[in-house]
Amino acid sequence: MSGENRNTTQRIQKILNSEMLKLNILASVTGLFVAILTWIFLELIDLIINVLYLGGDYLDNDLGYWAILIPGIGGLIAGIIIKYGSKGARGHGVPVVMEAVAINQSKLGTRLALTKIVAAATSIGSGFSLGRVGPVVLMAATFGSDLGQRAKLSVEETRILIGAGTAAAITTAFNAPLGGVIFAMELILSEMRTRSFIPLVVSTVMATAVARSMAGDLAAFSDLPAYTIVSSFEYPLYLILGLVIGLAAVGFIKLLYAIDKISENG
């Protein structure tokens, strides 16, 4: 009996000393703090909207035609923040993270992330047509990278923490846990392995619990009307619609990069 107890104790010690357990604990910590930071970012956007539009929003405010000037003011402030913060914040957040994971040993700059977050919140709050994905992903990935380096993790393990942070950020920003995991695995880690999948799920579960405790279980798109298929003839039309939208998306992306390139050269 004592031999069995000794074997059980050894197994427990082996589990407690395992790198996988350590990684999952750090992934849980990442999910906790990233959820809080992402919620603060979203609240900051709402605060800026409230201040700039005098208690209203983009469309419903008392500024009249003066509201047209608000995005310009916000853009000017964001430009100043980027100039004196980090000029790298001009770019897109997700590609910066992908580059760090692929060729920069999973290292990201804290100053860049802070500048990106503040500038993005100012831009979005003033009315710019910008998304939340890039800023929150960069912020979350930077947190994961910094935590991994402080915990003396390997480059590979730090890379997984970056993915865990990314998954937690998407989960919190859009209330989409599954979407967060898939986004991180496909775009950031570019792999489907158990070693990376489990920490991502752990981080996402923690982020979901924290986010819903603060903001409630609200769907990103909660007011969509119910829709039912009336005829089987609709299916070919959906295929055509998908093709058209896909081509339009490719064209939009190419146009976006072309304008970005012209802006940099100018």
Residue ranges, per PLM feature:
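Alpha-helical transmembrane segments and immediately membrane-proximal extracytoplasmic
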Residues: 1-266
